[in-house]
Amino acid sequence: MLHILDKQKSIINKFLAELRDINVQKDSMRFRRNLERIGEISAYELSKTLGYAPKSVTTPLAEAEVQCISDNIVVATILRAGLPLHQGLLNYFDDAENAFVSAYRSYSSESEFEIKVEYIACPSLEGKTLILCDPMLASGASMVAAYETLCAHGGKP
């Protein structure tokens, strides 16, 4: 499912504008915080698509039934640019497992490259919901390589 967050009127547009602004980009702390905020907003939007199951909760007055996320989530990122975005997702999916991929471009010429995966840390993905986050999407090649590597090491999500 594709959900383009900046096509709707919401606060995320402010954070995206600041990420793209050449003057704001110079403020490293603000840049990282905005990526984290975008991760948090993305987590909220993603949560609408996940599986839920009823859970009984004891309140001070009585038992109450609450719908809670039933998916087992793994949040994965491509190091290092994705770390603030990853943290934003974890702020909401705080019981999620983590996966990390270290990848880089290996150039054969000025215009040709392939993605090399250097390192991976990944739990089993079998039967789990994988959220692969990377803010540095240009060609999409790193994202594809990361996904294929994660599945090769952790199984099919």
Segments (PLM) and residue ranges:
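PRPP-associated nucleotide enzymes
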Residues: 1-157
